[in-house]
Structure formats: C-alpha cells, structure tokens
Amino acid sequence: MKSDSPVHGESHTECQSPCPLSCMPARLEGSTKRRLAANARERRRMQGLNTAFDSLRKVVPQWGEDKKLSKYETLQMALSYIMALSRILTEAERYSRTDPGEWTKMHFDHIQEEQCLSYMGVRCPRDCDRYLPQTFSH
C-alpha cells in the first residue's frame, strides 16, 4: 500500500492530494504562474477592446469634441449612425427607381440651418455651406 506522503527524494511537484506543507510552495508557485498568465491575457484582451473602441470613436459622428465618448455612448452613437445610414440607403434605392435628383432635393430641403450649425459646431450660416459637402461625402 502506497503512502499519501511523498517518499524521501521525490520532488514537491510530484505530490498527490492531500499534500503536506512541504508541497505548498510548489503548488503556490504553479497557481501564481497561472494567475499571472491569465492576468496578461486579460490585459491584452482589454487593450484590444479599447483599441477597437478608439477606432469606432473615430468613425462615429460626435456632437462635441470637448470630451471623449464613453464606451456605452460610443455604442449608442454607432447604432444610431448605422440605422440612419441604412434608412438613407433604403430611401435612395426607392427614389433611384423614379428620379435620383428628387431624393437629393428632398434631403437637402429638410436640413435645417440650426441642425447644420449645431452638428458642425459653427456659428455663422455662411460657414455651414462650406461644411455641407464634407458632412454628406462619407
């Protein structure tokens, strides 16, 4: 019958459960290494996620440049932006069958000066005209 305690000369890593106190340093060392590896993987995962959010923030319209959007706000803005673009494409497809110029006229007629100014962050109406092509070129 084999004893549960390690035989003299066996290494601490070969200990079986239940383990005497002499095996504890080897077990702690192993669990510490695993924890450090898991922490490093999680840190890399979070860095990748943060990089992805930074990339998304660059392409999502932002009302003000004074503060960075939170992750939640970034996702909300991305969803709204995607839905708006989908709506525009659907309408464009519907109007392209009849008169493509009518679709453009309809959208530009509905743009209010205040909306343009607040979106572009400008105060003067003549500045708005300068930014309109940039706004709709994406």
From Swiss-Prot:
Transcription regulation as UniProt keyword: yes
Residues forming the bHLH domain are 33-85
Q: What does this protein do?
A: Transcription factor that binds to DNA at the consensus sequence 5'-CAG[GC]TG-3'. Positively regulates the determination of retinal ganglion cell fate and formation of the optic nerve and retino-hypothalamic tract. Required for retinal circadian rhythm photoentrainment. Plays a role in brainstem auditory signaling and binaural processing. Regulates the differentiation of olfactory receptor neurons. During retinal neurogenesis, activates the transcription of several genes such as brn3d, coe3, cbfa2t2, glis2, elrC and xgadd45-gamma.
Q: What is this protein called?
A: Transcription factor Atoh7-b
Q: Name one GO molecular function term.
A: E-box binding
**Gene3D superfamilies reported in the protein's UniProt record:** Helix-loop-helix DNA-binding domain
CDD domains per UniProt: bHLH_TS_ATOH7
> Which SMART domains has this protein been placed in?
HLH
Q: Which UniProt keywords apply?
A: Cell projection, Developmental protein, Differentiation, DNA-binding, Neurogenesis, Nucleus, Transcription, Transcription regulation
Lineage: superkingdom: Eukaryota
Per its UniProt record, what InterPro entries does this chain match? ATOH7_bHLH, bHLH_dom, bHLH_transcription_factors, HLH_DNA-bd_sf
Cellular component terms per the entry's GO annotation: axon; nucleus; perikaryon
The species is Xenopus laevis
Q: Which gene encodes it?
A: atoh7-b
Q: Where in the cell is it found?
A: Nucleus; Perikaryon; Cell projection, Axon
Tell me one GO biological process term: neuron fate commitment
* Induction (free text): Inhibited by Notch and ESR1.
